[in-house]
Each structure stands twice: as C-alpha cells, then as structure tokens.
Amino acid sequence: MFRQMKLGSLATKLLLACFLVTCTSGLDIHPNLIGAGQKEGIEIWRIETFVPVPVPKSEYGKFHEGDSYIVLSTKEDKSKKGIFTWDIYYWLGKSTTQDESGTAAVLTVELDDALGKTPVQHREIQGQESEQFVKLFPGGVKYLPGGIDSGFKHTDTNAPGQKKLYQVKGAKYIRVRQVELSAKSLNNGDCFILDTGSEVYVWVGKNSQLPERLKATKAANQIKELDHRGRGKVFIVDASSTSREVKEFFTKLGSGSPSEVANTSEDDQEYEKKQDAMVTLYKVSDASGKLVTEKLSEKPLKQSMLKSEDCFVLDTVTSGVFVWIGRNSSIQEKIEAFKKGLAFLKDNKHPTWTQMQRIVDGGEPTAFKEYFLSWKN
C-alpha cells in the first residue's frame, strides 16, 4: 500500500504554506480547515494537489480509490454544551499517490494541533476500514474508480479479498502475525486463522494452549466484523470436526492435508523472546537545532525513555507501528514521526493491513504499555 515517501519536497511545500498562512492570518492551519470541528457531525476533505478540498455532503461515504481523504468526526458533550471531542481519520485509497497520502498525514497533524492536540487519529486503508469508521456512514462506504491524479480504472468493489493466513501464538502475550499461505506454515502446537476474503476459518492445533484458542476465536470474529463488515461466517476446525470439514479447510487453503501438519512448534517463550528482540524504539527530536531520528538500543524499554519534548516511533513488527506524540513536541517533530512511521511500514515489509496508531502523551493504550517495563499510570 505504502511506497517510499519522498516527503522532503512535500514537507517543504506544506511547511512553507503553513508559514504563509501564519503570516497572513495568524493561524498555523490551512485556510480550508479553519473553523472545522465546531459543531457535531462529520466533515470531509479530499486531497487535491496538496490542498484539502471540502467534499459536498451529498458525496459523503463515497471515496475514490486513487485519492486520500481526511474525515473529521465531532461529538458534543451531552452534559456540557459547546464541549467537543474529535476523531480524525485519514483514508487512503489503494491507488492513492505518495504525495496525496503524505499530505493527508501532515494536514491531519495540523488539524490536530488546531483542535488542541486532543483528537484521536486513525489511519484507514481501503478495504481494511475500522468498524468505527464505517459506522460514520449509515448508507455504507462506497468505492469509486479513479482519482485526481489517476486514470479511470474499473474495479469490482464487491470482489472477495486476497486470502491470508495468520498464526496465533504466545505464552504471556498472544500475538497474531501473517504467515505464508501454505500448509507448511501450520502446526498442531498453535492456532491459525485462514481469511478467504469471504469466510474465516480457525485451525485449532490439538496441542495449542487455551489462551491461544481464545485469542484466535476473538481475532477471527474481529476479521469478520471489521474487515468483512459482518458478512460471512467463522468456522472452527478442531479435533471434533468431521473429515469433510477438515478437507474443506485445506481446499480453501489451497494445499495440504492433516498428515502434513507438523506436531510441534517453536517454544512459546522462545518465540516471545525473538519477537521482543525485533521491537525497536526511535526518538524524533530537533533539540540540537537539527531534526534527528535516533534508534534507542537500550532494552528492556522503559517508560522514562519517552520524553514529552520529543516524539517517538515504536515498531513492534507483529502488532504494528505506534507513533507517540510528546505533549511539548514541535510541529516538525510530529511531521517527521509520521513520516518515519509510514516509512517503517514499507521498509520493514509490513503487510498492508498493519495498523499505524498515533499515541497521545498521557493517553497510552494497554497494547502500547505492554512493551515497556513497569509502566506507571
């Protein structure tokens, strides 16, 4: 989905635009975003040659696959009139250009700053939208061919998605990771999820642990509800399944048979050690006068390593990329952290479904805290 982003010239253009706006209006935000988020509802902008162009309400829910969009959801506190909370989504079509996706990310930071740095930011990928995003459009999300910078390309928006196979494994922290779509990836010591694009199958290894089985079932239902929008079914393939049901699983997988499945798997604790070793924390700072990204090699990771004056990027490999925004960080640091997060998705060969989450200083979710030793709230 993401290509290497050539954001040097892009960032320059955007920051210059911010400077000009600041000089003429006193506001560090694009003119088309001024006044956004002051009433309940949603507002949408389509990125056109580095500019956020408002989308007519009659077109809400329709997204061109060749473009990028910013969607702002505003909710008013029922008990305190005039007090709002916000969610900012930047939606990326499967054929969007690198300039458009980069502009959407940068303008999202601008909008976040304009709203007091309190909004929650979400990255949405065409075909992998979150349930929260889809619920914004009662009539559903519709994909339209083409885009501002792309030619017309006909696509079947109802076509089944690509098949994917996931391994569910772990002792203390259960992880879900995509593996090769092959019977050779299976073993009886773990659980696996086969997403055919229309149906979801859970292979329960006879020697797998109960937490792995529970996690696999939960993840499979999330794939059905979020990725398939509630369509299709979840099938469990375990020791109680009939030979016909097992055969159906391998037919959907495309190869193999039960006799080819290995009985043993890598030790869960050793597996977790390897996964933890791949986790990397980067600091993005301009304290020296220059914008520098530094890899922090100290392990284990500690909460004290996160400084409010800077931004950080945590690449967990299996659980996605987290961009941590220090409450006192500069706009340049925020933009660079976003750029690095997006670059890691490509450079580290993450699947397109991998999530990149923006984490607010002081509002860290449990999934993020798990990577740090003795986190204190």
From Swiss-Prot:
Residues annotated as signal peptide: 1-26
Key words of the record: Repeat, Secreted, Signal
Gene Ontology terms describing biological process: actin filament severing; actin polymerization or depolymerization; barbed-end actin filament capping
Molecular function terms from GO: actin filament binding; phosphatidylinositol-4,5-bisphosphate binding
Gene Ontology CC, one term: cytoplasm
Tissues in which the UniProt entry reports expression: Expressed by the venom gland (posterior main gland) (at protein level).
Cellular localization per UniProt: Secreted
Sequence ranges of the Gelsolin-like repeats: 50-133, 174-243, 298-368
Keyword Oxidoreductase: no
Entries under Pfam families matching the protein: Gelsolin (PF00626)
Gene3D superfamilies in UniProt: Severin (3.40.20.10)
Keyword Secreted: yes
Protein name, entry field: Actin depolymerising venom protein gelsolin 1
Species in which this protein is naturally found: Platymeris rhadamanthus
